[in-house]
Design a protein with these regions (language model features):
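Conserved beta-strand hairpin/beta-sheet module of binuclear metal-dependent hydrolase folds
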Residues: 1-46, 136-146
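Active-site neighborhood of phospho(di)ester-bond hydrolases with catalytic His/Asp-centered motifs
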Residues: 29-30, 51-58, 77-80, 126-129, ...
């Protein structure tokens, strides 16, 4: 059974998720935000070993803590190549600052790829639209949706990399997943996929 701890961090209350299999000390950190010391202190307090950082996208409020955590733990880092490539342009440096981080090599994830943290396995689902390379991570009955899908809403598309038609396609893909999932978004309260199918005005 997957155990999930939620740390809302910073002025933007970005949800950092620490996910692991019950009775396992190896965990994944999904979107560490930009307050890395809080993440590290939480993990240390629980006796957890951070195996991987999984980034749903490259916006600064989700990635600011990556360098510190990666340096102190030696963990692997996964994100989409599409967001990484766009981060390497000057005009996008504010929104996508991760390219300025000189930490260990980035691993680029792709649709359907399976990434492990201890006994937990996360499957990559490409969901562009909020950014060029936004992804969700599925693990058991959980979806870590980043800024693609929120409770009752969806991610904004007016920043570099945003596109309404693209995010609509991604939302349709999420809604079309079989069965129900708990949805853990980048901001705000968690929800369920079934609830969003019924109540979310952005899901057709």
């Amino acid at each position: 059974m997957l155990k999930i701890d939620i740390l809302p961090l910073g002025d933007y209350q970005t949800n950092c998720y620490i996910a692991r299999e019950e009775n396992s000390q190896s965990c994944a950190v999904i979107d560490p935000g930009y307050m890395p010391e809080q993440v590290l202190q939480f993990a240390e307090g629980k006796g957890l070993c951070i195996d991987v950082i999984l980034l749903t996208h490259g916006h600064f409020d989700h990635v600011g803590g990556v360098k510190t955590i990666a340096e102190k733990t030696g963990c692997a880092l996964w994100m989409s190549q599409a967001d990484w490539s766009q981060e390497n342009t000057q005009e996008n440096a504010f929104f996508y600052p991760i390219a300025n981080c000189d930490f260990a090599p980035v691993n680029f994830c792709e649709e359907g790829q399976r990434i492990t943290a201890g006994d937990a396995t996360f499957t990559v689902m490409e969901t562009p639209g909020h950014t060029w390379g936004s992804v969700c991570y599925l693990c058991e009955d959980a979806i870590f949706s980043g800024d693609t899908l929120f409770a009752g809403s969806c991610g904004r598309v007016d920043l570099p990399g945003g596109d309404w038609n693209t995010i609509q396609t991604s939302l349709d893909r999420l809604a079309g997943l079989p069965g129900d999932y708990k949805v853990y978004p980048g901001h705000g309260e968690y929800t369920t996929l079934e609830r969003e199918r019924k109540m979310n005005p952005y899901i057709r």
